[in-house]
């Protein structure tokens, strides 16, 4: 765990209290110091002096139907534990690196004025990464708001223990009671929605419920038109059920230089309309229009708050390059066949072989989110760092890859996307956006949460930006913003069945 400056006795007392309060059923500890605190853990528990001792035991082989969080410094080589577990089950997993996510958060924070607040998007299961684990990490790093699409996403986070303010971007008319009960703040984009919300709040006896007013400045998807602001103000003034907490709009093309003039017009329109709304009320109404690309390209449009989306998950929407990779989709080779020249592979005999080949089957298919258009040699995965093209049609649960020129064996890993094969490569092949690929990874693919400390994919141009780098160092030295350490970073889920942790890092 992160260095806290506390004594081991006090620290592990706090660890034990949190483990017990979160319903963790089993703990596996590695290291001498945590072994001395064994009596504090009144649950099923196992302790080992070293990682090697744990690996040599039969404990990991006996784990069944359990959600496992592996947390530890690189000195403990806990990646060997993850490798052992993956090999045991031969499963396809989406590995989420929380340290990379925090690095991305800090990168964009370094672009902001100190007083600028931040909304972090965790809708669509945090872009496929897993809502709770991401939300908990962001809450620990003191973001101002989380944003989800629908009320059920927000209530699930509340039930899991998330206390941070939550914004609902697509509120349903049938979910107002849920929003009131769980303090979920809805976006309001039309008079119909506003009137129904006021009616529901008055029925429940709710007053001054915070809402977020959306303005349409050019997206033409949802939002009040600027000319509707006077009528909106009049409606809001005549009731006490709801109160505007923020007003915002959505930039259409902030990631494209060809749209710069349109983006500037949007910003000007928003500034004028939001000022009109603010002047009608005595309390402060937060204003926000910048998304990820806007943070980077329009620093003068930060207003009071910004919304961080795809950049949080490691993708720069302006350059389509990786900042720090967060998500790695990987699987293992199930079987390798020696297939003669002129034979075919897969359904409809689409995979025609022009040479004697070694064909490997891996347990991932279109039901897991692997797009069928990647088959028949249109894309590849990585096996032991080398390109292995997809052969034939991608099946529902399995696909085949050509490993003829690769030194590999059954049980070896295959990387679908990750550090060395960015998801942006696949999105370009498919002529789509990385969002679609990330959110298409199905729920049956297990999410494994890690905290890998190596910053392998730190953006080079970021390191060359002297001002940004100095600002990050300054903040780190003063331990402000999200650079503060926190005591118990490794208990990441209310639903954990097993926690594996070391002594102090």
What are these language model-derived features?
Residues 1-103, 110, 145, 151:
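ATP-dependent carboxylate-amine ligase
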Residues 27, 70, 157, 247, ...:
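Residue-level signal for inorganic ion chemistry
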Residues 93-95, 102, 116-288, 302:
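Active-site-proximal beta-alpha core segment in soluble small-molecule metabolic enzymes
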Residues 95-97, 102, 110, 117, ...:
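Active-site anion/phosphate-binding pocket segments in diverse small-molecule metabolic enzymes
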Residues 498-504:
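Short, intrinsically disordered C-terminal tails of secreted or membrane-associated proteins
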């Amino acid at each position: 765990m992160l260095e806290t400056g506390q004594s081991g006795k006090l620290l592990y007392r706090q660890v034990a209290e949190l483990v017990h309060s979160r319903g963790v059923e089993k703990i596996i500890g590695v290291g001498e110091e945590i072994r001395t605190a064994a009596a504090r853990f009144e649950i099923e528990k196992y302790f080992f002096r070293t990682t090697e001792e744990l690996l040599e035991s039969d404990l990991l082989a006996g784990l069944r139907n359990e959600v496992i969080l592996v947390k530890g410094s690189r000195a403990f080589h806990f990646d060997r534990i993850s490798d052992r577990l993956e090999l045991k089950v031969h499963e396809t997993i989406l590995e989420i690196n929380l340290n990379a996510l925090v690095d991305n958060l800090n990168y964009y924070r370094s672009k902001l004025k100190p007083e600028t607040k931040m909304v972090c998007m965790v809708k669509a299961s945090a872009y496929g990464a897993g809502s709770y684990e991401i939300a908990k990490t962001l809450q620990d790093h003191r973001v101002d708001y989380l944003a989800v699409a629908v009320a059920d996403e927000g209530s699930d986070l509340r039930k899991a223990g998330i206390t941070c303010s939550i914004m609902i971007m697509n509120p349903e008319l049938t979910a107002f009671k849920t929003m009131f009960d769980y303090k979920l703040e809805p976006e309001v984009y039309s008079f119909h929605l506003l009137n129904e919300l006021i009616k529901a709040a008055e029925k429940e006896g709710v007053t001054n419920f915070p809402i977020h007013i959306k303005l349409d400045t050019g997206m033409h998807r949802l939002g009040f038109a600027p000319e509707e602001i006077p009528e909106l103000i009049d409606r809001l003034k005549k009731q006490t059920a709801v109160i505007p907490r923020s007003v915002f709009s959505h930039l259409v093309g902030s990631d494209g230089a060809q749209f710069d003039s349109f983006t500037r017009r949007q910003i000007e329109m928003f500034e004028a309309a939001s000022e009109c709304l603010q002047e009608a009320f005595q309390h402060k109404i937060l204003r926000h229009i910048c998304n990820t690309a806007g943070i980077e390209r329009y620093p003068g449009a930060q207003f009071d708050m910004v919304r961080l989306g795809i950049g949080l998950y490691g993708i720069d929407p302006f350059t389509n390059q990786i900042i720090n990779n967060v998500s790695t989709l990987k699987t293992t080779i199930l079987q390798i066949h020696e297939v003669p020249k002129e034979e075919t592979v897969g359904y409809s005999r689409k995979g025609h072989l022009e040479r004697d080949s070694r064909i490997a089957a891996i347990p991932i298919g279109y039901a897991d989110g692997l797009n069928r258009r990647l088959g028949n040699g249109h894309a590849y995965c990585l096996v032991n760092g080398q390109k292995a093209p997809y052969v034939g049609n991608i099946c529902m649960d399995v696909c085949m890859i050509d490993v003829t020129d690769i030194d590999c064996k059954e049980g070896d890993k295959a990387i679908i996307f990750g550090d060395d094969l960015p998801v942006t490569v696949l999105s370009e092949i498919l002529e789509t956006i990385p969002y679609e690929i990330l959110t298409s990874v199905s729920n049956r693919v297990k999410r494994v949460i890690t905290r890998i400390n190596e910053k392998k994919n730190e953006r080079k141009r970021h390191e060359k930006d002297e001002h940004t780098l100095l600002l990050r160092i300054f903040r780190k030295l003063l331990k402000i913003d999200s650079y503060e350490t926190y005591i118990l970073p490794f208990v990441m889920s209310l639903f954990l069945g097993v926690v594996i942790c070391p002594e102090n890092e």
